[in-house]
């Protein structure tokens, strides 16, 4: 008699995805982030569900309802801070996951990569709308500034912005619809994750060498299940340390002031994980140009498969490309720092230089270095 996990229609799918999945024997800890992102998503949906039970999406009571969650609901403070800091963990892992994909050439799995980029956009949209919900000063002004960027779109811009707002400013209608979208998007993300995995399992995982690993595969369980559990353990230690000891470390103090349309905060800025894109947006002194640069800073990921000119898939054996990769990482850190600084000298010029370097590295330096490496290896 066949084992139930191999014959049952539903359990069979789980078996082929997480138990008997043939996996390269040499994948490193950089391959842990997929499962960590899955755990993060589950955690966010769970904590978010409990928060939604006590939250009210109304401009007059939203701020007080969050205060009520933290003060009166049993372990409400824990749920709230796990949700807020869980989002930060989510983005840390997302950026590591994408960085891993770039370093090891995983973007050659075109379907998986493109669905991944769509997932990134969906997660960014969800996080942005979630930041608006507590209805603090930074929530309100962040929503106003970011939605207002759409008015840069020629001809339909203004109509589009007012349509999103549901009025002539960010108000009750905006908050209600943002809550509705913030609630539904994680479930859409979950469905997209399944498609992401479906495409990945069509080809099988990449590995650090970038070479075909069909001749050396091992079952996912128990080898990688135990490795993933260790990753989850480290993640939970990091997350709970953050939640218990400094829950507001990554937040903005301005968001502890209720939203006031008559009082603008001195520095309007998004959460830390959007600062690199915000710096690119601010580095161009033209509204439409800034919006296009902002969009392209993420959309540029779609060009990686086209810009891959090396004969080798992975960067493991390409020291020059490795230098550029780490230069890009340092550049993104500089952009993140600049995004949180006021718009004044010398931050303006540093931001502009870092933005130019970001695009120049990806579009010109990396492909030309790949060609040079081919030449050096007489390929």
Swiss-Prot record:
Keywords tagged on the record: Electron transport, Heme, Iron, Membrane, Metal-binding, Mitochondrion, Mitochondrion inner membrane, Respiratory chain, Transmembrane, Transmembrane helix, Transport, Ubiquinone
Localization, UniProt: Mitochondrion inner membrane
Binding site for heme b b566: 97, 196
Binding site for heme b b562: 83, 182
A single GO BP: mitochondrial electron transport, ubiquinol to cytochrome c
InterPro entries hit by this protein: Cyt_b/b6_C (IPR005798), Cyt_b/b6_C_sf (IPR036150), Cyt_b/b6_N (IPR005797), Cytb/b6-like_sf (IPR027387), Cytochrome_b (IPR030689), Cytochrome_b_C_euk/bac (IPR048260), Cytochrome_b_N_euk/bac (IPR048259), Di-haem_cyt_TM (IPR016174)
UniProt binding sites for a ubiquinone: 201
Cofactor(s) the record lists: heme b
Residues spanning the signal sequence: none
Record-linked Pfam families: Cytochrom_B_C, Cytochrome_B
Function: Component of the ubiquinol-cytochrome c reductase complex (complex III or cytochrome b-c1 complex) that is part of the mitochondrial respiratory chain. The b-c1 complex mediates electron transfer from ubiquinol to cytochrome c. Contributes to the generation of a proton gradient across the mitochondrial membrane that is then used for ATP synthesis.
Subunit structure: The cytochrome bc1 complex contains 11 subunits: 3 respiratory subunits (MT-CYB, CYC1 and UQCRFS1), 2 core proteins (UQCRC1 and UQCRC2) and 6 low-molecular weight proteins (UQCRH/QCR6, UQCRB/QCR7, UQCRQ/QCR8, UQCR10/QCR9, UQCR11/QCR10 and a cleavage product of UQCRFS1). This cytochrome bc1 complex then forms a dimer.
General remark: Heme 1 (or BL or b562) is low-potential and absorbs at about 562 nm, and heme 2 (or BH or b566) is high-potential and absorbs at about 566 nm.
Family label: Belongs to the cytochrome b family.
Protein name stated in the entry: Cytochrome b
Organism: Ctenomys tuconax (Robust tuco-tuco)
Gene name tied to this protein: MT-CYB
